[in-house]
């Protein structure tokens, strides 16, 4: 199966979901589009009937003072439609904010104009946490198959089927940590920690970008996340200078 985990030229749809939160967002969008199409069809039909009857009817509508039944209908019907869209939306919003029993935590720090990742659950023999910085790959250093303005020199590596909590903050100005395939979009604010969680259900490479205007090089802050099997993640940890689990 081919997955769309990166932006495509002239793409007019969502990237494929890799987490339950992202799947819920896609389903909510589909349901809302159905309700909106239903309302558009009904309103268009009413306008068509009104214009057609008004043209052929010599009776002056200015003598019609009110229509209680009609007024109730055009008040209650939109209200019901709004409730049908609001309840699933609020449920998904609160579910996305819930962070319960994460298996591991990754701290994400936004800086002008790069990202820094800290794995606070894993420390080296010297007591230092695993941390590194991620910069956009210069165009003259891109290899075949790499993406312009999306690939980075280092990736954030996380294990598959693992509840990961992201603690997001910034060191200078406002940034925004955004991963469309994971259903993540959280502000990175200086002096404040925002948290969001993700359960990636399949391996792959996912891309995102800073979504908050943060300066002249705002467009040069890509995010590259590699979701790997747990065995590969442990092997990657072993390459990070004698790391053990805290």
Swiss-Prot record:
List of residues binding Mg(2+): 212
GO CC, any one term: mitochondrial inner membrane
SUPFAM superfamilies to which the protein is assigned, alphabetical: Cupredoxins, Cytochrome c oxidase subunit II-like, transmembrane region
Outcome, altering residue 51 to I: In strain: CBS 789 and CLIB 381
Binding site for Cu cation A1: 175, 210, 214, 221
Role played: Component of the cytochrome c oxidase, the last enzyme in the mitochondrial electron transport chain which drives oxidative phosphorylation. The respiratory chain contains 3 multisubunit complexes succinate dehydrogenase (complex II, CII), ubiquinol-cytochrome c oxidoreductase (cytochrome b-c1 complex, complex III, CIII) and cytochrome c oxidase (complex IV, CIV), that cooperate to transfer electrons derived from NADH and succinate to molecular oxygen, creating an electrochemical gradient over the inner membrane that drives transmembrane transport and the ATP synthase.
Name listed for the protein in its UniProt record: Cytochrome c oxidase subunit 2
């Amino acid at each position: 199966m081919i997955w769309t985990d990166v932006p495509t030229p002239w793409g007019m749809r969502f990237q494929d979901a890799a987490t339950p939160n992202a799947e819920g967002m896609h389903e909510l969008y589909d349901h809302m589009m159905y309700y909106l199409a239903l309302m558009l069809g009904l309103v268009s039909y009413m306008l068509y009937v009104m214009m057609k009857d008004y043209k052929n009817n010599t009776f002056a509508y200015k003598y019609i003072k009110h229509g209680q039944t009609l007024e109730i209908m055009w008040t209650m019907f939109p209200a019901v439609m709004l409730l049908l869209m609001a309840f699933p939306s609020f449920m998904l919003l609160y579910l996305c904010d819930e962070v319960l029993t994460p298996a591991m935590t990754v701290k994400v720090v936004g800086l002008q104009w790069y990202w820094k990742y800290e794995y606070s659950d894993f420390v080296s023999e010297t007591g230092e946490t695993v941390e590194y910085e991620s910069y956009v790959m210069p165009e003259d250093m891109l290899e075949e198959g790499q993406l312009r303005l999306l690939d980075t020199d280092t990736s954030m590596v996380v294990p598959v089927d693992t509840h990961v909590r992201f603690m997001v903050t910034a060191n200078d100005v406002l940034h925004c940590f955004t991963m469309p395939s994971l259903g993540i979009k959280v502000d990175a604010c200086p002096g404040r920690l925002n948290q969001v969680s993700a359960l990636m259900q399949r391996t792959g490479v996912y891309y995102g970008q800073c979504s908050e205007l943060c300066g002249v090089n705002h467009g040069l802050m890509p995010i590259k996340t590699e979701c790997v099997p747990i065995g590969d993640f442990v092997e990657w940890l072993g390459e990070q200078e004698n790391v053990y689990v805290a």
